[in-house]
Swiss-Prot record:
Taxonomic lineage: Bacteria, Bacillati, Bacillota, Bacilli, Bacillales
Native source species: Staphylococcus epidermidis (strain ATCC 12228 / FDA PCI 1200)
Binding site residues for GTP: G11, P12, V13, G14, A15, G16, K17, T18
Keyword DNA damage tagged: no
Disulfide pairings: none
Protein name, per record: Urease accessory protein UreG
Assigned GO CC terms: cytoplasm
Signal sequence, start to end: none
Length: 204
């Protein structure tokens, strides 16, 4: 059984977590063996969405119904996600990379370091220019931070420049990107981070 790298994807409901996984997997699945675990409170809606996109065979995607508070299942009691990892590896023992999508949660949600090796936190512009200024733990502690749906900025009166400045205050030099996942704008920066910082491509 392999020991795959695990990347957690966190963020509020509707920020673009599932779409991010779809886009990234579509790019990376040609080069490596990938699995996905989704967390939803009472349904397996995100699992169904990913299955319907066809980015991976159905046996490489597992939906976890967390119940209650979704952040508990990725931090305080991650047993359901550990079980899902074991099941994925029993189905496909060649898996090299697993994405674990959290249920939509608040800005304070973070992944247990025992569950994932790296984490990405994603918000969207429509949630307000002030979100990066709030400095939630998900944004501050994640290895990579994404501000999605940049095309909506003019409609909600958000300044991307101000959001970038506020992000840099809390994250320092830690990487982040603006994206519009609908058009793939900014996706390349996310892919590059995964390839170079997570998969260590190009290092000898």
């Amino acid at each position: 059984m392999s020991n795959p790298i695990k990347i957690g994807i966190g963020g509020p409901v509707g920020a673009g977590k599932t779409q991010l996984i779809e886009k990234v997997v579509k790019r990376l699945a040609k080069e490596m063996s990938i699995g996905v675990i989704t967390n939803d409170i009472y349904t397996k809606e995100d699992e169904k969405i990913l299955v319907n996109t066809g980015v991976l065979p159905e046996d490489r995607i597992i939906g976890v119904e967390t119940g209650g508070c979704p952040h508990t299942a990725i931090r305080e009691d991650a047993s359901m996600n550990f079980a899902a990892i074991d099941e994925l590896l029993e189905r496909n023992d060649d898996i090299e990379l697993i994405f674990i999508e959290s249920g939509g949660d608040n800005l304070a949600a973070t992944f247990s370091p025992e569950l994932v090796d790296f984490s990405i936190y994603i918000i969207d512009v429509a949630q307000g220019e002030k979100i990066p200024r709030k400095g939630g733990q998900g944004m501050i502690k994640s290895d990579f931070f994404i501000i999605n749906k940049t095309d909506l900025a003019p409609y909600v009166g958000a300044s991307l420049d101000q959001m970038a400045k506020d992000t840099e205050v809390f994250r320092g030099n830690r990487p982040f990107a603006f994206t519009n996942l609908k058009t793939d704008e900014g996706l390349e920066k996310v892919i590059e981070w995964i390839e170079h910082d997570v998969l260590l491509k190009g290092l000898t």
